[in-house]
C-alpha cells in the first residue's frame, strides 16, 4: 500500500489538476493567450499522474469488491471473484511503483529543445561510418516523435562517413528523452573495409545539451570573436562563393563553434550563437551539479561522456545499455529510430534512483528532527 505521505502528495496534485481545469474555462484566462497556454501546459504536465491515481483507486475498489464476494453463498460468484482477483492483485504493486515515480521532481530542462553533437571516436573510417548511422538513428527517432531536426554543421569522413555533426532537435519535451543519449556508443561488427572478416570495435561520442535561451545565459558580445569563411562540402571543396560560414570563439572559455549550413551569414551566426549558449549553459549546469554533490560520480539524467553507455553488437543482433542493464535485439529497427523502449528503460531506472535518494534524504531529515 502507498504510504499516507505519498497519497497526500498525489491528492494535492489531483486538487491542483482540478483547479487548473476550472481555470481553463474561466473567460479571463481563455481571453489571455499567454495565461491560457501557461495553465494548459501545467495541467498537461500532471494529467498523466492524475489519470494513474484514479486508475489506481479504481483498481483497489475492484480488488475490495471481489474480496467481499469471496464470502458470498453463491459458489459461482466466489469462483468468478477468485478469477478476477488472480488478475487484479498482481496489478497493484506495479501501479503503486509507477505512482511513486510520478512524484520524482522533474528536471527543469526537460521541456527544452536540444543540440546534439555526434563525433567519430576510436576506429578510423568505421567509426565515421557508424557516426553517420547514429546521426540517422536520431533523425528517424525525431521523425517518429514529430520533432523538427536541423543540421547545423557537419564534417564528412571517408566512405560516406561523418567525422562530426551537430543537430538541433526541437519539439515537445525533447531533452526529457534525448538526455539519456550522452556518452560513448560502442559498435562491434565486421567493417565493410575488413577483408579478413574480423570483428572490430569502434566508438562514437554523443553529447546532448539543452538549448539555452538568452534569459538562461548572458553572453557579452565583447567576449565573442567572429570569423567568417566559405562553406565547404564533405570532401573539403568550397560549395559557396561568399563568406557565409561563421565561426565564433568565446574568449573567456576558449569554446569554438561554427555553422555553415545556411547560405545566409546572419542565419549561420544566429545558429552558432545558439550552439554557444547551449555549451555555456551546460558548463554552468555541470558546475552546479558538482557543487551539490561533489562525491557522486554518476550524473543522473545527463550521462557520463567518458563511460561506454551502450554497445551495438551486430553479429549477435543485440543492443545493450550498460547503465541500466537493458538488452534488446533487432538492430536494423534500432538504427531506423526504434529506440523508445531503450529511452523508457533509462527514464524508469533513473527516476527510481532519484526516488530512492529522495526517500533516503527524507528519512535522514526525519531522524534529525527526532
Curated annotation (Swiss-Prot):
Domain of life of the organism encoding this protein: Bacteria
Region annotation (Disordered) ranges: 286-311
Bias-annotated ranges (Basic and acidic residues): 286-296
Modified residues annotated as N5-methylglutamine in this record: 237
Location(s) in or outside the cell: Cytoplasm
GO cellular component, one term: cytoplasm
Modification comment: Methylated by PrmC. Methylation increases the termination efficiency of RF1.
GO molecular function terms attached to this record: translation release factor activity, codon specific
Protease among keywords: no
Pfam annotation, one family: PCRF
UniProt entry tagged with the keyword Cytoplasm: yes
Protein name: Peptide chain release factor 1
Organism: Anaeromyxobacter sp. (strain K)
